[in-house]
Amino acid sequence: MSGCTVRAARAGDEPGAYHVCLKTGNHGQDGAQLYRDDPDALGRIFVGPYLTLEPELSLVLDDDQGICGYALGALDSRAFYARYESEWRPRLCAAFAEPHGDPTRW
């Protein structure tokens, strides 16, 4: 890992961090085959909230090819979850249509 740098996450890091999330999203293995229709899905669910709601506790690992890792945290898990539910989740849900048809067939 020569030439790697740990730094505070900043605006614009989402695509790189989401990509890392996808590439490790199948039990640590590449999840790209599972999320072909929406490669950013895992990142929007698991990475985006921290980058947005807890930026001061969001770090990324950079190398010469871009973001290759991250460490994310929340100072207060209960407060973070409350903000996730009131701020992040509604935006996420609003971006996608409700499924149609018989719910037993989803």
Predicted segments — roles?
Residues 36-58:
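Active-site rim helix/loop that mediates acceptor-substrate recognition in acyltransferases
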Residues 16-20, 45, 66:
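Alpha-helical elements of Rossmann-like donor-binding domains used by nucleotide-donor carbohydrate transfer enzymes
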Residues 77-106:
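Conserved acyl-donor/pantetheine-binding loop and adjacent beta-alpha core of acyl/acetyltransferases
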Residues 60, 66-75:
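Conserved beta-strand in the GNAT
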Residues 19-36, 49-50, 79:
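Helix-loop element at the rim of GNAT/NAT acetyltransferase active sites that forms part
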Residues 5-19, 75:
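A short beta-loop-alpha structural element at the N-terminal edge
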Residues 11-12, 64-66:
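Short strand-connecting beta-turns/loops that link adjacent beta-strands
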